From Swiss-Prot:
GO terms for cellular component: chloroplast thylakoid membrane; photosystem I. PANTHER family: PHOTOSYSTEM I REACTION CENTER SUBUNIT IX, PTHR36082. The gene is psaJ. It comes from Marchantia polymorpha (Common liverwort). It is a single-pass membrane protein. The keyword Transmembrane applies. This is Photosystem I reaction center subunit IX. Pfam families: PSI_PsaJ. HAMAP family: PSI_PsaJ (MF_00522). Belongs to the PsaJ family. The lineage of its organism: Eukaryota, Viridiplantae, Streptophyta, Embryophyta, Marchantiophyta. One of its GO terms (biological process) is photosynthesis. The chain crosses the membrane at residues 7-27. It is found in: Plastid, Chloroplast thylakoid membrane. Keywords: Chloroplast, Membrane, Photosynthesis, Photosystem I, Plastid, Thylakoid, Transmembrane, Transmembrane helix. It comes from the Eukaryota.
Length: 42
């Protein structure tokens, strides 16, 4: 039962950090490459 409580308290925290990082990354990409339909990295 302790493992379930640990999972329920950890997964939302990790998801929040991951989605926050992903949102920040997308915002920065759109800042340097505005209105890009295809990322011009290659």
């Amino acid at each position: 039962m302790q493992d379930v409580k640990t999972y329920l308290s950890t997964a939302p925290v990790l998801a929040t950090l991951w989605f926050g990082f992903l949102a920040g990354l997308l915002i920065e990409i759109n800042r340097f490459f505005p209105d890009a339909l295809v990322l011009p990295f290659f």
